[in-house]
């Protein structure tokens, strides 16, 4: 939800550009009220999309990616995966189509992305410089971004979660 909130505030996108897919009807109702398209169907959400952001719990990544694999256009669509602790090798395996895998980006924002104040860590996987710039431009609109090696991603995850942990203590 936080990433969609930030994208809705972005100057790069209009609400009509954004489709949110979720299994939770109140979440869909909220984003529909903001002008985004909403659906319960992940495959439907992928049709016609230039950028697909899979933002799920780590244990849901495999099922989600395998569920959209057949409708992904590896040549024209950009894929962002936001999930802690999921190696790119696993994602490649899950998305393999006869030896072909998509370009994708491992991305770890923090909760401040909803307010366009995130420090977002990005690991390009088989991406060109041009593709990487397109993705960093989007996340720079939502705060700041830093390109990093995948081996450093666990540290990025810890840093991204630190804000949420601190907010939990403040709330207590």
Where are these regions (language model features)?
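Alpha-helical elements of the RecA-like P-loop NTPase motor core of helicases
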Residues: 1, 29, 62-66, 89, ...
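NAD(P)+-binding Rossmann beta1-loop-alpha1 motif at the extreme N-terminus of oxidoreductases
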Residues: 1-40, 44-48, 117-118, 141
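Alpha-helical structural elements of signaling/regulatory helical domains
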Residues: 13, 74, 126-127
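Conserved beta-strand termini and adjacent loop/short-helix elements that scaffold enzyme active sites
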Residues: 21, 39-41, 107, 148-151
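Short alpha-helical
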Residues: 25-26, 59-60, 86-89, 130, ...
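Rossmann-like NAD(P)(H) cofactor-binding subdomain of soluble oxidoreductases
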Residues: 34, 42-54, 58-122
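Internal alpha-helical scaffold of NAD(P)-dependent oxidoreductase catalytic cores
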Residues: 90, 94-103, 119-156, 166-172
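Alpha-helical transmembrane segments of helical membrane proteins, especially in multi-pass transport
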Residues: 161-165
């Amino acid at each position: 939800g936080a990433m969609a909130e930030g994208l809705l505030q972005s100057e790069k996108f209009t609400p009509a550009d954004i489709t949110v897919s979720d299994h939770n009807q109140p979440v869909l109702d909220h984003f529909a009220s903001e002008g985004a398209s909403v659906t319960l169907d992940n495959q439907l959400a992928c049709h016609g999309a230039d950028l697909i952001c899979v933002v799920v719990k780590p244990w849901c990544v495999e099922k989600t990616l395998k569920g959209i694999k057949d409708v992904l256009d590896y040549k024209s669509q950009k894929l962002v995966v936001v999930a802690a602790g999921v190696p790119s090798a696993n994602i490649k395996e899950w998305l393999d189509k006869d030896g072909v895998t998509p370009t994708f980006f491992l991305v770890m924002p923090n909760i401040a992305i909803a307010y366009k104040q995130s420090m977002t860590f990005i690991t390009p996987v088989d991406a060109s410089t041009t593709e990487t710039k397109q993705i960093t431009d989007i996340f720079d609109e939502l705060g700041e971004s830093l390109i990093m090696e995948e081996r450093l991603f666990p540290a990025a995850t810890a840093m991204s979660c630190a804000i949420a942990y601190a907010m939990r203590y403040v709330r207590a």
